[in-house]
Design a protein with these regions (language model features):
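Acidic, polar-rich low-complexity tracts and alpha-helical solenoid repeat scaffolds
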Residues: 2-7, 14, 18-226
Length: 226
C-alpha cells in the first residue's frame, strides 16, 4: 500500500515538473519575442525596412506575424504581396508561388493582381537558378521544360487579363522566348529517341512541335523526324 502511494506521489511530482518546465519554456519564448506588443503599424514598418535592406528572412518573419495577428488589418493585402516577394528573393520559389496563389484567390480583382501574376511567373522559372541563362542557350532540361510551361501559362494569363499592364510587354517577350525554348527542347528529345530507335516516342515529340509550336523555326526539324 505504501509503495503504491509512493509511486502515485512520484508520478504526480513528475507531472508537475513537466508542466512547470513546459510553462517556463512557453513564458521564455513569449518573453524573447520582442514583437509581442507591436502594433500593426510597427510590424509593417519593420517588415518593410527589412525588405528594403534585403533582409529577406527577417522580413518574412515580420510579415508572417503581421498576417497572423492582424489578418483583416489595413496592411493585410500589401503584406501578402511583399511576403511573396521576400520568399522569391530569398530563393524559396515554392513559398513565393504559394503566397501568390493565395493572394490571387483572396483578392482576384486587386489592382496589383497583374504584378502578382508577373512575380509568380518569375518565381516559377526560378531565375536565380540560372534558368534564363540556359534559356538563352536554348539548353533546358525536362524539369526546366515543365517550369517553362507553367510560367508560360501564367504569363499568358497576365497578358490576356491585363493587356495594358506595365508588365504586359515584358510578359509577351518572355512568352516568345519560352515558346522557342520549349520547341527546341522537344526537337532535341525527339532526336534523342530517334537515334535510339524509339520511333514512336520520337514521332510523338515531333508531332508536339508541329501541333503546338508550328510558327517556330523548329517546325521543319520536327517534320524531318516525322
Amino acid at each position: 500500500m505504501k509503495k503504491a502511494l509512493r509511486r502515485t506521489a512520484l508520478g504526480i511530482s513528475m507531472a508537475a515538473v513537466i508542466t512547470l518546465t513546459a510553462s517556463c519554456s512557453w513564458l521564455s519564448t513569449v518573453n524573447d519575442d520582442k514583437t509581442i506588443n507591436w502594433s500593426a503599424d510597427k510590424l509593417y514598418t519593420e517588415a518593410r525596412d527589412s525588405l528594403d535592406n534585403s533582409n529577406w528572412s527577417q522580413a518574412e518573419e515580420y510579415y508572417t506575424k503581421l498576417e497572423s495577428r492582424y489578418p483583416f488589418g489595413r496592411y493585410a493585402q500589401q503584406a501578402q504581396i511583399e511576403m511573396a516577394y521576400a520568399y522569391w528573393k530569398d530563393g524559396d520559389p515554392a513559398q513565393a508561388i504559394q503566397a501568390c496563389d493565395r493572394f490571387l484567390r483572396s483578392y482576384p480583382n486587386h489592382p496589383a493582381s497583374d504584378y502578382v501574376l508577373y512575380m509568380k511567373a518569375l518565381a516559377t522559372l526560378n531565375e536565380d537558378d540560372g534558368f534564363f541563362a540556359r534559356l538563352t542557350r536554348q539548353d533546358i532540361s525536362d524539369r526546366d521544360a515543365q517550369a517553362a510551361r507553367d510560367a508560360w501559362d501564367t504569363f499568358r494569363e497576365l497578358v490576356q487579363k491585363y493587356p495594358d499592364s506595365r508588365y504586359a510587354p515584358e510578359a509577351r517577350r518572355r512568352l516568345n522566348e519560352l515558346i522557342l525554348a520549349q520547341a527546341n527542347h522537344e526537337v532535341k528529345v525527339a532526336r534523342f529517341y530517334f537515334i535510339r530507335h524509339a520511333y514512336v516516342a520520337a514521332v510523338a515529340r515531333a508531332q508536339r512541335v508541329i501541333t503546338d509550336y508550328s510558327r517556330t523555326p523548329y517546325r521543319d526539324d520536327a517534320l524531318q523526324i516525322m
